[in-house]
């Protein structure tokens, strides 16, 4: 790109930096959201709620399906 190109793009550096940070935050959030260990913990907690009578079978099934979908889909590949 050369020196002239770098100088012309210099005013956009904060915007490019912000975009990079946002991409990193989204990537980490997705990594945590789709982490199999985290999903397993949530499934265990969901089972505890069902056994304690805090949620009914219908709610359990709905939330369990959502968690299993997360395990199946995994993070987006960019």
Curated annotation (Swiss-Prot):
The keyword Transmembrane helix does not apply. Pfam families: GvpG. Its main location: other. It comes from the Bacteria. GO terms for cellular component: gas vesicle. It is found in: Gas vesicle. Induction: Gas vesicle production is induced by growth conditions that promote production of secondary metabolites tiancimycin A and B. Keywords: Gas vesicle. InterPro entries: GvpG. Belongs to the gas vesicle GvpG family. This strain probably produces some gas vesicles from the probable gvpO-gvpA-gvpF-gvpG-gvpJ-gvpL-gvpS-gvpK operon; it can be induced to produce more under certain growth conditions. Might be a minor component of the gas vesicle involved in nucleating their formation. Gas vesicles are hollow, gas filled proteinaceous nanostructures found in some microorganisms. It is not clear what function gas vesicles perform in soil bacteria. This is Gas vesicle protein G. It comes from Streptomyces sp. (strain CB03234).
């Amino acid at each position: 790109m050369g020196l002239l190109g770098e100088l012309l793009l210099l005013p956009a550096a904060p915007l490019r930096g912000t975009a990079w940070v946002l991409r990193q935050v989204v990537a980490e959030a997705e990594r945590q959201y789709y982490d199999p260990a985290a999903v397993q913990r949530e499934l265990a907690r969901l089972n505890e709620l069902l056994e304690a009578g805090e949620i009914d079978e219908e709610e359990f099934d709905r939330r369990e399906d959502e968690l299993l979908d997360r395990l199946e889909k995994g993070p987006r590949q960019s």
